[in-house]
Amino acid sequence: MRERTRSDGETKMVNIGNEWDNLLADQFRSEYYRKLRAFLVDEYNRYNVYPPADCIFNALKYTPYSKVKAVLLGQDPYHGPGQAHGLCFSVKRGVMPPPSLKNIFTEIHSDLGIDFDMSVGELTDWARQG
């Protein structure tokens, strides 16, 4: 959770790298966000927290606002090393997909006839498509 300094000297707390930066700029400068960020920095310093700090905004990094077509929301965050990487239900390549993701694949296959490799649970390509 490193801060970046802009050319005007103002510290930028988040750098997503696309249009989300402008859309959320006021939020990232707000008092509630500063408190939340301080809390998270402390948590990351004291505990094993998932996803890694540099992955927190991956969903926004991979999907610019103008490209969003669907939003997936998860209920139970991943809590093991190598699982969470900032995309709901997704796990990095080489990590077996959890049952919840396999259920999603099964439902999509049932409804739309689309086949999935059940051994790959990395959804970055989905995020890039919106």
Task: Go through each PLM region and give its residues.
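A polyanion-binding, active-site-adjacent surface
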Residues: 14, 26-130
